[in-house]
């Protein structure tokens, strides 16, 4: 739901006899709202970076393991970044944490271009088409705020002759997304996409169901729930993000079984 609707939904639950409510996906960052009702909880992914630090670590690891990524040998990462909808709570943090994490690892970023792809494949392709036309093989890395935009970026670079044979391509731009959607996993397997971040919807769903069972049976909300983090102030149960590369595709695939 729209997080601004949370107070209204909470009031409805109070009026209905103090019915428990569990919010998920979009975090309610105004903790006064979530703490205004003892039977309100939220299930989200870990951290305020929305997976960007893990995404950045994949870029850092690739940079260190593949010296050829520094195409012009200047010691800087020539980066293009596709941001999500500016109105979404995850968009700016993903962008900011991505860049700060890379820079904190001692890698200087030369940001060639940054724009919003609005979470949409077609919009991201349009942006990347323009960037590839302008910068071509100067681009050393493309990072997108979600997988849909990463797929749009891939479509653009492949149309320009990049990434067509995965990492063995004569012209290659590492591309990273977030979500580890089923449609991107085959692209990671082929090397056309370099990595993604799993926002574990399966575990989130299982956690929500277990919490609902607990709350309706008078137990503590997180009783018997393992492998998650809790934050008392936010009344949040957080499911960890996971980096997904060729090396652990089975982890992502298992969430869709």
Regions found by a protein language model. Give the residues of each.
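Hydrophobic alpha-helical
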Residues: 1-19, 97-98, 112-187
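Hinge/cleft segment of the Venus flytrap/periplasmic-binding protein
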Residues: 75-78, 82-86, 100-101, 200-257
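Short, solvent-exposed amphipathic alpha-helices that sit
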Residues: 51-58, 89-108, 123, 127, ...
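Flexible loop/hinge segments that line or gate small-molecule binding clefts
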Residues: 9-50, 69, 73-75, 182-189, ...
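Short glycine-enriched loops at secondary-structure junctions
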Residues: 25-29, 85, 117, 178-181
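Short beta-strand elements in bilobed, periplasmic/extracellular small-molecule ligand-binding domains
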Residues: 78-81, 103-121
